Amino acid sequence: MYNPHYGYFSKHATIFHPGEPFNFSEIEDGPEFHRLLGQRYTEFEDRLDETDPDDARQLWHTPTELFRPYYGEAIARYLVANYKLTLYPYHDLIIYEMGAGNGTLMLNILDFIRDTDFEVYQRTKFKIIEISSSLASLQMKNLEESINAGGHMGHVEIINKSIFDWDPYVPSPCFFLALEVFDNFSHDSIRYDYSTGLPQQGGVLIDADGEFHEYYNLELDPIAARFLRVRQAAARRPFPTPLGSKLMRSIRNKLPLQPQYTQPEYIPTRLMQFFDILNDYFPAHRLLASDFNTLPDAIPGLNAPVVQTRYKRRTVPYPRRLYVSLSRL
C-alpha cells in the first residue's frame, strides 16, 4: 500500500476534492446529493485530465472532503468540549492524526477552534503522522496555500514516518484521530479445519512467471497466534468465526462431499499492533476512530476485503484476492 516505488497511496491514489463545500440545506434528498457529487467528480477528473490524462487513475473520497467543513467542525466540538472538561488548563490540547489525506480535517479543526475559542487555539498543537512522502508534501502544500497558513503554521507538525516505526515516548495527554484508517491496515488470512477446528495461516508464493499462488500452513506466525489467543481471552460474548457452532460442524462432517476447510477469516493483526503502539508510546491517549461497518462487493470470507481497481473512471471489482497492479486490499 505504501511502498515508495509502486505502493497504492504513494504512486496511484488521488484524493477527490469537491471544490466549494456543498450547500446541504438546499439539497432535497440523497439522490440529488449523489447527482451533484457525480457532477463534481466529472469536473474534478476533467481538470486532472487536462494536464495528466490517466485511464487508470485511482480516485477516492473521504467524509472529510464530502462534508467539509461540518465533519471537521463536529470533531473539533468534541475535542474542545472534552479538553475543557478534563484537561484544561493544566495541559495543552495535543491532537495526533494518522492518515490525514489532503490535510483537510486538520485545517477544518484548526479553523473552528480559532474562530470559536481563541484561548484554546493558542494552546492547540496538531501533529500529523503520515507514512506517505507524497501525501506529507501535499499536506504541507495545502497548509501553506491556505488563507490561514500564517496563523496555523505555528500549531502544526507533519511527521513523515510510519506509526509502526514510532519510538518517541509521549507522556502528555493527547487525542489520537484515526478516521478510515483501520480498513487499510493489513490483515492475515486464516482458515479452519472443520474436523479438528485447528487454524491455518495463509501465505503467497510467486512463481518464475510472476504468478501468485496461495497456500496455507498449520504453523501460525507469532503475531497471528497472539491475536487468536488475545481474542479468545478478551471476548465478553461469542464472536463469529467461519467454523460455526459445534452442532452444525458435527452435522456437516457427516454429509458427503463437504469441503475440509472453511472459507478464510481475515483477522486484524496490524490493528492489534497499532494498539500496542498506543499503549507503549501514548499512555495518556484518547482514541477517536471511525471506519466502515460493512463493505459491498467483498470477496468470499469473514471480514473479507474489497479488491478493486479503477479504469476509465469506472470501479472494477475483482472476485479474488491475489490481484496485483492497482488493486486495493
Annotate the PLM regions.
Residues 100-101, 181:
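Beta-hairpin (beta-strand-turn-beta-strand) motif
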Residues 171-329:
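Class I S-adenosyl-L-methionine
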Residues 1-96, 102-173, 190:
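Rossmann-like AdoMet
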